[in-house]
């Protein structure tokens, strides 16, 4: 038998109708995750066409994008002030009730960011196909699943048929080797990959991350890597399942139990790429040479080492890249050749589906413990789910954040996309652990530096872009 990649195995196992020269493939979807922003039109289409949800048992909804993260009132209820957000949340509740879809609503102990709750509930499993009306669905690929975002019309199609029309993408091995230096995290790995190879490197491909560095990462670190595959242009990102994967899934609410668990693990062990399998393209990264990373522009590919300098137009041979740099620096009010270390900041956001899990909060709290954030800096700490929040509070992490002067908020997408009052004011600078730094992403006129939780905390302490390595061990 011809050796196959991880992607090949998962794709081939889900073909309902093979791809031909004239038509794309039809593939079966194992898990469909939905939220309040990209699903309303899909449900409207179902009603108009008299259709039902084919597999409500393979569908799960949560509220995350529009949910306020404001602390609960005296009555224990999270207040929803924004009228549009309230309407979206009500609509999702009505849609799920009508079509029989389980929902983790605002106020549920399991509510949270869709790409946080899937893994923590044990819904995300190796070998699955997983879709959601959200581009960062690639997060679930950390488990050896084929997971990607879909559009609203495709959401309707999956709800009605549990299938999806797709053209088979190519494969790209992203090999990462070398031991990480202190202060360098999974977030720095993915920012470095995107900075080196560009936001279009993965166009038409699925990334498979391999190498000793990837194998040494925890599951939550692997999720950070796969989360930003889309920022590298890829359709999805995958990491082969191993014992680290199985240990993470074991015992979670929706994980297989008993004999079914043994059978599942036996199958999952067959998924890693076969020796001799051929990728369409291979790129590499020496992780031992990495330092903490930070972005300086208006796409995630505009990144550099924390102690570096913004490139000059002369360093960019491509005219389009020079034009993009000029436009980005005008928006960011920065100069070519300028260092970012010491650049004043106004906001720090610790959260998003990239970096809001318990390990991220632990990492940040360790660095912040016994310290204060700088005067004039607003720091928002937003756990990725109610379960993460509960665990963090059980460990006393929230008290560390509050004692330092940070806001401890409820679970949700929050400032990643500038929802409700979780915004960066116009013209102000934020160090953010999220995944996108587009113009206006965190609020009209907001200027975003993407970085790791460690860099975010160090910057909050200094009130300026800071290198976290100076705080390690102290």
UniProtKB/Swiss-Prot annotation:
[4Fe-4S] cluster binds at residues 353, 413, 416. Pfam families: Aconitase. Its cofactor is [4Fe-4S] cluster. Gene3D superfamilies: Aconitase, domain 3. Heterodimer of LeuC and LeuD. Catalyzes the isomerization between 2-isopropylmalate and 3-isopropylmalate, via the formation of 2-isopropylmaleate. This is 3-isopropylmalate dehydratase large subunit. It comes from Roseiflexus sp. (strain RS-1).
